[in-house]
């Protein structure tokens, strides 16, 4: 048997999307992933024509809008005819314009608005006041003289009236508002978006034809198609126990294709005492991963959080610290260059500044530059928390994250490949906010990875875990997922979320992982199909590498499924 990839009469591998919604066709409002991170002279039309917002473009003056917080508001028209509302004479952070809406606890709401401020740039939040209290829906670093898109989302615990408004701590600035949208989606619609994206982004509809050596179709032929390797990296962190634990190895390699070492590559593990390096644990773990074709993320070179610095590091003078960090970076990156796919260069530098406070504000830029010089193939990531987990954390908001990336890019001049690392340690996920934030970050066109996914313990931990897992996997901008701390030899003493018990029997979270792997086609590594009367078979397959074998034949041939191969001709010749 051979696979013919050329010729005009051959069968085309169609890569059009097949939309499957758990067996149910859902007539859903399409979700708009558009996010604009440039500041514009004039705002675009509101998404979803404003959704349930009254007078979203302010074309009818102040209709539907009211004062919030004792400020003054007025309707204005720009020289080019754009209508907007300005909140001025502000004396408190929450003084702005507002609108009352009714929210349903069973729906998910995506929110967007275009914001401008006077005087100087300022972080502006959208706040929803409801029976649940005050909840931020998103924020943006608003500019002077141009419009910035604020995109976010909200859910509520109880149905009823609500009111949204805008706030900034800088009371000296006026807040300008235009093109506001609040669009509700049902749970079924939201899930249909995930299913559509999974089929469109992670899979392709493949049409194969089996023919004999003379090109004649072979009807009713039984073929076996085997997934050899899925393109999308999906995995979990590992610890040193995996090196000598066969059960651990079997459990991991049967499910995952990428990993991060939980501690063994970190500075406090490789140089506990000054000048005495020990990479034996990390080396053994890397050998295991390489043997089994598991991709490895380098985590991490430095960690800005002061509480994770060793005593001997804390005792160094600035000059000695510079020497020590140079040695550390050169040592770990040179050792593993070409063996890891990525580096978390200076972990959590949006929240902490241990090295920046001692070695200069641009030390992160220098760390990235030196890492890129030593390892020219790896993607260099920022890695931080609360960008998608908590919409109220100003330190790691989407705007703040993108600003830091912009500073890095400006310093590096495009000399290295940058990536967006989102730790994703969730408590109660705000799913619409997660999707909107991923939209914003994806507008940078940089690869996004979910690097340390888990959910804190609680009554709804497993429900939330499945929700967030489906959401991030289905987003077009996400290019890899690593779950954090899935196993502990001490029982359910994982960092937050155990997938299995000490004997590698599934816990509820492990059942979730196996369920979605099966749905996504990663557990169904072998698919048996029968050709029709014309020798054709149609399958929706993951992007990845496959082998195909005809019944009663031993030889297997390989083919690739990838969106880039649209229009490629494939013929299976018996």
What are these regions (language model features)?
Residues 4-238, 242-255, 315-316, 375-378, ...:
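Extracellular and organelle-lumenal recognition/adhesion modules and their flexible linkers in secreted
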Residues 183, 262, 346, 423, ...:
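Conserved residues at the C-terminal ends of beta-strands
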Residues 233-235, 257-260, 293-297, 340-344, ...:
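Structural preference for beta-strand elements that scaffold enzyme active sites
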